[in-house]
A protein has these predicted regions:
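Buried hydrophobic packing residues in well-ordered domains
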Residues: 30, 90, 127-130, 137, ...
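Structural recognition of beta-strand segments within beta-rich domains
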Residues: 134-135, 143-168
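Alpha-helical, heptad-rich or low-complexity scaffold/stalk segments
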Residues: 1-115
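Short boundary/loop segments of OB/S1/cold-shock single-stranded nucleic-acid-binding domains
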Residues: 116-123
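Extracytoplasmic
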Residues: 25, 122, 128-132, 147-151
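Short beta-strands and strand-coil junctions in structured, solvent-facing domains, enriched
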Residues: 16, 37, 77, 97, ...
Length: 168
């Protein structure tokens, strides 16, 4: 992935569309909206940090994983909308209005409401072989227009529970 590809992916996840303008401005806006501070380092280091915080679950739950856990706990569904819309919808559902602040602070406040802690209680686990996970397509597929490399969005059709835990 190029720097612009990674940055655009994070922007689409957070805002719903890739932003335009100089990379430096786009990086600064994401950092400000996400944590409220600008980080030090090279452009690529900063983009990788934003990308990893959004998608990587290897050291801690990613923003997407946290949002999925919050939404499922609060409304028993997980939306395919952008993060900005998902946070807003949950705040209106919980508080009756939207809050101000960074994505991080808003997610922490929702987590305190849902779980009694700013930290969402998630643990990594291994899904046993042959575990059935039913999925439903989000987008209508047309075999005539479908080609290798196309993104096909899907969602869980049913909850997958293992040892009393919901698996994401």
């Amino acid at each position: 992935n190029t720097a612009d590809d990674k940055l655009a992916a994070v922007e689409v996840t957070l805002y719903g569309t890739a932003q335009t303008g100089p990379l430096a401005d786009r990086i600064s806006k994401l950092e400000k909206d996400f944590e409220g501070v600008h980080t030090e380092g090279s452009m690529m280091d900063r983009i990788n940090a934003l990308y990893d915080a959004t998608y990587d679950n290897s050291t801690s739950p990613s923003l997407i994983t946290q949002m999925n856990a919050l939404e499922w706990t609060i409304s028993h569904k997980v939306s395919m909308d952008c993060m900005q819309q998902r946070v807003t919808d949950m705040e209106i559902n919980v508080y009756g209005k939207t809050s101000t602040g960074t994505f991080k602070s808003r997610v922490e406040a929702l987590s305190e409401f849902a779980f009694g802690s700013k930290t969402i209680p998630l643990v990594q686990t291994t899904i046993p072989a042959n575990t059935l996970a039913k999925v439903a397509l989000v987008d209508r597929l047309n075999a005539k227009n479908l080609k290798k490399g196309d993104v096909v969005r899907f969602k869980a059709a049913e909850d997958v529970i293992e040892d009393g835990m919901l698996l994401f």
